Curated annotation (Swiss-Prot):
Transmembrane segments: none annotated. Predicted to be exported by the Tat system. The position of the signal peptide cleavage has not been experimentally proven. Its main location: periplasm. This is Ferredoxin-type protein NapG. Residues 63-92, 100-132, 141-177, 188-219 form the 4Fe-4S ferredoxin-type domain.
Amino acid sequence: MKVRLKSKKKMKKPALNPERRKFLKEATRTAGGLAGVGILLGLQQNQSLAREGVPLRPPFALQDAKAFSAACIRCGQCVQACPYDMLHLASLLSPVEAGTPYFIARDKPCEMCPDIPCAKACPSGALDRQATDINESRMGLSVLLDHETCLNYQGLRCDVCYRVCPLIDKAITLETQHNPRSDKHALFIPTVHSDACTGCGKCEQACVLEEAAIKILPMDLAKGMLGKHYRLGWEEKAKAGHSLAPKDMISLPTRTPEGTTVIPEPAEPVLAPILGSGK
């Protein structure tokens, strides 16, 4: 005897509300985005803890950061041309714009190649291809930041930064000072001269301290710039061959060591002759 079972009708799933579907889709997308941001921030935090140093540009790079970033086409040819593997191509997590070349002096300084292959390989003008003298490059400026830990400031003869300088006695010299601790010895203080320092980074890389007391900083951080509105009187006098200010034109009170103040009489006004007046 055959028994025929009745088939159960399939239950239809209720249709998902379009608004609810849209909400779940947006929520999933937002959660994924936040997770990605968290990963990136974590990587950047780990990178910052690494304290890899100040990023510097290759020799003869355009000094203006915006101009360099605009001129660099991120081709990496300068990095490939460096025979010492000193240059790096920046990634998304690097301290400079992705795809641009940089180096960390504490890790690997510039070896000052006489033929400047990195600059010669640049096709865009971000690096000066016409440069011929590597000693004229200005990758940064050496600055002795920490006098409290520098061994020479403690009265010890370290002199390593001075000895490794490619332009010894020009870019870095040793200046003597009295040692107040012993009262009978001299301190030999490393002194950087900005007119000769190339910013190669050999001094920073060679510093014997765990954290270098001398560092290479970008020029805009290391050196103040005199505003265009300033005029140095002695320079203007040398250019003109005479003083540009009439004698006794400016009269300021004179304060004597005794504490008295002498106020000079006002000078006669000086009128410049009017051109074409014949006077």
